[in-house]
Amino acid sequence: AVLFAAMSFTSCNTDGDSGMNILTLEQQKSFQHAMAAGSYNNMTILYEKKNDANVKNQVDSVPSSCSISMYGDSTMTMYKFPVAALAEHISNKDLAAAIAKEDQRTIKCKYNVMPNSTSEVAYFIACPEAINLNLTYGTDNKSHKVVLYFIPSQMYYGYCSLKEPRQLGFQFALYQIWVDGYQTNFIQNSTNSANTTVGFLFRNAWKK
């Protein structure tokens, strides 16, 4: 689903960007070091949320921040990810109730800089690593191992400006929920019941 297509993202179908055209390891690290030099403290995480009072605004947000590893190891850290916000998109009521009680999480994201990057903007694909939860729920009050898997945007690259003022943003989605080693069919987007993913956008917070 293209939830935030109005943002200034670059299409993944950029002309001339083929699977054979990739950055060398040295080029990749050079871009990553340039990205790490920036400060990304005033960020926000936007996510899909049902809003019956305004059908044109099916989005909510939480403040966040980000740090990018200076070691060129393709990792960035996202703070205050709203795990509990996923509850309304889960069809299993017991699991949803357990998810709703979860605190915000600090999560690692893996990213890879794309070859259409320039000296001013690094374009990249990014995705959070899986979130592992140990939850107790259900009528039998049993403990369950729950894993949340994400997928990067299939339509738009993320971006990071390499000059001040720094701008960074990328899209991703909750893609699968596994419980006790089994893939489930529990994702049911509350804003569109036909959608089996939940969209997120991580970007700079807009000034009011």
Model-derived features: positions:
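Tryptophan-anchored aromatic micro-motifs
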Residues: Q32-N54
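Polybasic, proline/glycine-rich intrinsically disordered low-complexity segments
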Residues: C66-S67
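Acidic, glycine-anchored loop motifs typical of Ca2+
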Residues: A53-P63
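Bacterial Sec-dependent N-terminal signal peptides
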Residues: A1-A36, W206-K208
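Edge beta-strand at a domain terminus
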Residues: S18-L23, F150-Y159, K163-K208
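Predominantly extracellular/secreted and cell-surface proteins with exposed
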Residues: G72-C160
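Intrinsic-disorder/low-complexity loop/linker signature
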Residues: D52-N54, S74, T139-H144, G181-Y182, ...
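Short hydrophobic/aromatic-rich beta-strand segments that constitute the beta-sheet cores
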Residues: N42, T77-K80, F170-F172
